[in-house]
Amino acid sequence: FSLEGGESLIPAIDFLINSAAEKGIEEFVMGMSHIGRLNTLVNIFGKSSRDIFGEFEGKDYEEDIFDGDVKYHLGWTSERISTSGKKINMNLAPNPSHLESVDPIVQGIARAKLENDFDNNTNKVLPIIVHGDAAIAGQGVVYEVIQMSRLKGYSTGAVSYTHLRAHETTSD
């Protein structure tokens, strides 16, 4: 599930994070499916290739307690420094194989951070959701979450939605 054909996602997210940090955002909560996820973990979240391959080899998790979903759907939390030197907290939410079920999770994590850590200051947390082609169908969880985000109890102030078109190559 490479990012082939959509490589511009990495510099786009990097630009978004650095620009938002300049405006005062301190926490980013991101949700995405499998396409480009490993690339994003390494290049945006700073997860080492060694950690990723360790998960694939099954050395980091006891099989009894692991939920059985694919390992590249696990979440990750990290801290990074923006291009201007600001500390940024980063969270990539775990994503189950039902691709867009992560959307309300991301919104909920962001809302909880706003309420518990930032006194509801919506200028401190930015949710980022990356969708694949199949998610933009005009109905379903994506649009439900967008509609809920307009309700007082669910609003996070803003959400960055990105549509990533899946490019698959085949040979004859």
Model-identified regions with their sequence ranges:
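Short acidic, glycine/serine/threonine-rich loops at helix termini
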Residues: 38-45, 136-143, 150
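N-terminal amphipathic, basic-rich helices that act as targeting or association modules
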Residues: 1-43, 50-51
